[in-house]
Regions:
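C-terminal segment of classical bacterial N-terminal signal peptides
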Residues: 14-22
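Residues in and immediately flanking transmembrane alpha helices
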Residues: 15-16, 79, 206, 286
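Positively charged n-region of N-terminal signal peptides that target proteins for export
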Residues: 1-6
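A short hydrophobic/aromatic micro-motif that marks alpha-helical segments and, especially, helix-coil
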Residues: 17, 81, 139, 203-204
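Active-site-adjacent loops and short helices of periplasmic peptidoglycan-processing enzymes
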Residues: 22-189
Length: 388
């Protein structure tokens, strides 16, 4: 059973606070994204907003929707629910998807690995629906999972109606929410093996070999870009959620509603340049870093490893000091079995000169099953005998 953090800590997670390195006034004054309907620029590890323009305005996200689709795929892989070599059969419905596709045929089987390529590189609508059906049983059930995950991430201005981004009523997101989704997706290090690849092939060694070229051209033309997802429909115009890493710093730039692909890429390029010229990050922890061993009551094991859920860094203006940084661990009270791998069990709070600069969930590294009454009885008797 999940135990919840005190309200103050939950609120701080959903609405992060940052120290002086992140100044809204500085970000707003920058001449960026002048030819986009909305935009946002964040640093990945802290989630700090470096620039924004109409970033909370709900708009159609087009194929950037597939960022959430990939989150759920990567989460299933991470938890061992599926494997990369597992075969996925395309239904007649999945194969019927229009728009960008990898031309799946009804009944055709591809591995999860190839489906991921088709989604991340080729923006395949058919591959997205095939994976949705494979994971949830139906597209409708998968959409429910998408919206549940959006709620878990605290995304208040996002609602999905399909896993593809094809135009449909009641399907929208914002630049800020899309950046938070990209932040979540990038927790999975291996995702950039797909989103960062400029070209690849499907159906190798067959007469139906299919060439994939990344719809995100910045992967090839901007050093450090290795994701994440483009989008286009007549209503949405040209959209892009991009990420780039230089040195220790990874940033995410989102643009909605550019008139041309060139304008879209120019807006994103300028935002990336701004981030790398103005800011720096100092890494503190990698994802899955062991923070503490916590006691678990009524579990088949007495303790569980508590680890970071994402990379954790300190963000400052270039040249600023990173001294006086401290960390504080706040565990959920009364951890009880069962616990699931990846379940939130506490919070790591990062402070600089006593002020909170970022906060990040701590999670269980593995599963802890509920102990049987016999197991608990033997444990109790062992403690009794030991004390005697």
């Amino acid at each position: 059973m999940k135990r919840f953090l005190p309200f103050v800590i939950v609120a701080a997670l959903l609405f992060p606070t940052f120290s002086h390195p992140v100044s809204a006034a500085e970000g707003q004054s920058a001449e960026l994204a002048t030819k986009a309907r909305s935009a946002v620029l964040i640093e990945r590890d802290t989630g700090a907003v470096l620039f924004e323009k109409n970033s909370q305005q709900p708009l159609p996200p087009a194929s950037m929707t597939k960022i959430m689709t990939m989150i759920l795929i990567m989460d299933a892989l991470d938890k061992g629910k599926i494997t990369l070599n597992e075969k996925v059969r395309a239904s007649e419905y999945a194969a019927s998807m229009g728009g960008s596709q990898i031309f799946l045929e009804p009944g055709e089987e591809m591995t999860v690995n190839d489906m991921l390529k088709g989604i991340a590189i080729g923006s395949g609508n058919d591959a997205s629906v095939a994976m949705a059906e494979h994971l949830a049983g139906s597209e409708k059930a998968f959409v429910t999972m998408m919206n549940k995950k959006a709620k878990q991430l605290g995304l208040k201005n996002t609602h999905f109606a399909n896993p593809t981004g094809l135009p449909v009523k009641d399907h929208y997101s914002t630049a800020y929410d899309m950046a938070m989704m990209a932040k979540e997706l990038l927790k999975y290090d291996k995702i950039t093996n797909y989103t960062g690849k400029y070209e690849d092939y499907l159906r190798q060694n067959t007469d139906k070999k299919f060439w994939l070229v990344n719809t995100n051209r910045l992967v090839k033309f901007y050093q450090g870009v290795d994701g994440v997802k483009t989008g286009f429909t007549g209503e949405a115009k040209y959209c892009l959620t991009a990420t780039a890493k230089k040195g220790n710093m990874r940033v995410i730039a989102v643009v909605f509603g550019a008139e041309t692909p060139k304008e879209r890429n120019t807006q994103v390029t300028q935002m990336l340049d701004y981030a790398f010229n103005q800011y720096q990050t100092t890494p503190l922890y990698k994802r899955n870093a062991l923070i503490v061993k916590a006691s678990v009551s009524k579990g088949d094991q007495k303790k569980v490893n508590v680890v970071t859920s994402e990379p954790i860094s300190i963000l400052t203006k270039k040249g600023a000091s990173t001294k006086d940084v401290t960390t504080e661990v706040k565990m959920n009270q009364d951890l009880k079995a069962p616990l699931q791998k990846g379940e939130e069990v506490g919070m790591l709070i990062i402070k600089k000169k006593g002020q909170v600069v970022s906060q990040s969930p701590l999670v269980s590294q593995g599963n802890v099953k509920e102990a049987s009454w016999w197991h608990l009885f033997k444990r109790t008797m062992g403690m009794f005998n030991h004390s005697s």
